[in-house]
Amino acid sequence: MDKNNQKKFVLVHGICHGAWCWYKVKAQLEAAGHSVTAVDLAASGVNMTSLDEIQTLKDYCKPLLEFLSSLGSDDDKVILVAHSMGGISASLAADIFPSKVAAIVFVAAFMPDISNPPAYVFQKLVKDVTQEVWMDTVFGKPDRPLEFALFGPEFMAKYLYNLSPLQDFELAKMSVRVSPFMTNNLAGTISFSEDRYGSVTRIYIVCGEDVAVPVDYQRGMINDFPVKEVLEIKDADHMPMFSKPQELCALLLEIADKYA
């Protein structure tokens, strides 16, 4: 592919997951000739940061922020592709480095607005969720107020991987790690800014069979903070990179052609 047509994708995972969850998407985008970086956030995937070192959202997102910081002024802008809780991480990155981001693509992701604290969109969904719904998910409360979570296999099977291949679910069971839970204690209470994060092009990909972040909730976030374009993968569960990787890649390539 001509260098002028090559796009730069940066893939941002959600909690308990890591760069590993993007293996199908990364391979397909690279096969199409594009540059793809899948980041392990702190204490995720193979990143060896200890949970004790994560006190803030910036701490958790440090690998992503360091990658964007390393890009020179001559580098092309990146397309941030954010899944699930990765939407909050990508939004922080865009708030800090708006000039380096061509667009954020929210894939069944929590999308902060510019009037509420960053964690609000997640806390609003889970505030009434009972322990029965979380099933075998394990929560830890250390001495400090930051909370941690580890998705259990029963929860993942029912809510995250319900339409995904069994092999990918097995990969997830072996690979998930304890992650910081998105609270105001972690993310702070200051909203992202209108002139930085708010100025970056945002696209939302709705996953039509998502039972973790239901379609009505996905569309509610879009209504509350409208985006440039809304696309949908009708038969995707919460993990479209596993359940509908080809459809997801096709949309990402379409987005890259339009916005990067």
UniProtKB/Swiss-Prot annotation:
Q: List the active site.
A: S84 (acyl-ester intermediate), D210 (charge relay system), H238 (charge relay system)
Catalysed reaction per UniProt? Answer: methyl (indol-3-yl)acetate + H2O = (indol-3-yl)acetate + methanol + H(+); methyl salicylate + H2O = salicylate + methanol + H(+)
Q: Which pathway does it take part in?
A: Plant hormone biosynthesis
Q: Which class of enzymes does this protein belong to?
A: hydrolase
Highest taxon of source: Eukaryota
InterPro entries named in the record: AB_hydrolase_1 (IPR000073), AB_hydrolase_fold (IPR029058), MES/HNL (IPR045889)
Q: What induces it?
A: By pathogen infection.
Which keywords accompany this UniProt record? Hydrolase, Immunity, Innate immunity, Plant defense
A molecular-function term among this protein's GO annotations: hydrolase activity, acting on ester bonds
Q: What is its EC number?
A: 3.1.1.-
Task of the protein: Methylesterase shown to have carboxylesterase activity, methyl indole-3-acetic acid (MeIAA) esterase activity and methyl salicylate (MeSA) esterase activity in vitro. Required to convert methyl salicylate (MeSA) to salicylic acid (SA) as part of the signal transduction pathways that activate systemic acquired resistance in systemic tissue. MeSA is believed to be an inactive form that needs to be demethylated to exert a biological effect.
Q: Which family does it belong to?
A: Belongs to the AB hydrolase superfamily. Methylesterase family.
Q: What is this protein called?
A: Methylesterase 7
Source species? Arabidopsis thaliana (Mouse-ear cress)
